[in-house]
Amino acid sequence: MNIFVDQDNYKEVSLKLTKKLLTSEHYQFLLCFKGEKLDITISVTPQSLVKLRDDINELIFMFSD
């Protein structure tokens, strides 16, 4: 999963957790980008969310030196 966000266009990024009941409990994570002209919501699986977190942590570590 690749997500590219122009910081000038999107000032607010949020993560929402919604619970849907299908055959059993199913959790859906919604990654929301609020922009001046366009709002984007991406549904992600828990595995993708963990990968995204790890990628963000790696970027933070690279730029913290």
UniProtKB/Swiss-Prot annotation:
The protein's organism comes out as Bacillus subtilis (strain 168)
Q: Which gene encodes it?
A: yopU
Q: Under what name is this protein listed? A: SPbeta prophage-derived uncharacterized protein YopU
Q: Which domain of life is it from?
A: Bacteria
